[in-house]
Every structure is written in C-alpha cells, then in structure tokens.
C-alpha cells in the first residue's frame, strides 16, 4: 500500500477530447458513467497484471463492488486515449472505514485504481494518469492519495517510488 502526499500540477497533455488529437497524441478525458464498461476492463487488467488470459483472484467479484459498482463520475477519473484508441485509465475511490479497497489509508484520502493497456506500457501513460489523478484529488480537497499494488508487480513499484510514493503498510499480497 502506498500513499502520496505531494500534490503536483499535471504537466502532461491537458484534458481535452480524443476527437481533436492525432494518432500519436496522448489525450486524457474525464471519465463518465458511459466509461464504466471500459473501467471494468481496466479493473480486470489490474487483477490479472495485464494478462488478457489470466485468472481473476478469488476476491475479484467482491472487489468489483467497491472499485466499479460504487464508483460514480463525481468521484473522479480519466481515460487516456492514444489517437482514437483507449490506452488506459485511472479512477478515484473514496473509501470509508466500513467500505474500502486494499489501498485505503483513511477517509478523505482517495485510493487510485489504474491500468494501462499492454500495447502502451512504457510510453508514460501511467505517469500522465497518476499526475492527472493527483491534481484532481488536490482540487477536490484531498490531503494525499493512496493506492495498492501487488507485491509481485515490480514495474508498478518502480513507477510509484519514482513518482514519490512511499510504502506505508502491507496487506496480504499487497
């Protein structure tokens, strides 16, 4: 489990429309209710470490309720587009002491859920999404953000440490 209390201004591509971009541009679009199906796909990718054929964990259905069913667009999120192709996304989950995900630290600090499509890994999309989500959380009054990453996900660990996250605890497998 990681927490980030540095709120940084997003310095990557501004939020705009995928319709106004070329195929090489990275565009972040505010996630809406109509993106729920794509967020569900991204949630699957977080559970299987991006393995399209991977088996979901035993807790997948229970976790889906918190991470997807309870998410509403007013909680915040972004979809990354590379041209006209969705490349990943991030969404904020504002847990309570009673209902929360693996990365919950405390009420008022949103937990991020993030995934990038395999074909776009290593292109800075995860960084752009994290910066956008961090800025959004700051604008929404959060003193920090948190996330959870599986112990075996070394690539994600490197990214989060590089961006200033600190490990603040461990839960089984995370």
Where are these regions (language model features)?
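Conserved acetyl-CoA-binding loop-helix of GNAT-fold acetyltransferases
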Residues: 122-135, 158-162
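Conserved GNAT acetyl-CoA-binding A-motif
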Residues: 137-148
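Conserved acetyl-CoA-binding loop of GNAT-fold acetyltransferases
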Residues: 161-170
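Active-site rim helix/loop that mediates acceptor-substrate recognition in acyltransferases
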Residues: 43, 54-82
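A short, internal acetyl-CoA/4′-phosphopantetheine-binding micro-motif in the GNAT/acyltransferase core
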Residues: 111-121, 149-150
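Conserved acyl-donor/pantetheine-binding loop and adjacent beta-alpha core of acyl/acetyltransferases
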Residues: 81, 87-113
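Conserved beta-strand-loop-alpha-helix junction that forms the acyl-donor binding cleft
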Residues: 147-156, 173-174
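A short beta-loop-alpha structural element at the N-terminal edge
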Residues: 26-41
């Amino acid at each position: 489990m990681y927490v980030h209390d540095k709120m940084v201004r997003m310095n990557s591509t501004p939020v705009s429309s995928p319709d106004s971009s070329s195929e090489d541009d990275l565009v972040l679009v505010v996630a809406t209710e109509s993106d729920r199906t794509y967020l569900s796909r991204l949630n699957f990718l977080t559970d299987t470490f991006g393995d399209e054929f991977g088996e979901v964990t035993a807790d997948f259905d229970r976790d889906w309720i918190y991470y997807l069913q309870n998410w509403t667009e007013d909680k915040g999120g972004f979809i990354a587009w590379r041209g006209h192709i969705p490349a990943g996304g991030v969404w904020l989950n504002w847990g309570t002491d009673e209902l929360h995900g693996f990365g919950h630290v405390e009420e008022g600090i949103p937990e991020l859920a993030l995934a990038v499509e395999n074909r776009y890994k290593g292109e800075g999309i995860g960084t752009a999404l994290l910066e956008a989500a961090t800025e959004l959380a700051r604008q929404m009054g959060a003193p920090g953000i948190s996330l959870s990453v599986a112990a075996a996900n070394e690539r994600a660990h490197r990214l989060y440490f590089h961006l200033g996250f600190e490990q603040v605890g461990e839960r089984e497998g995370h």
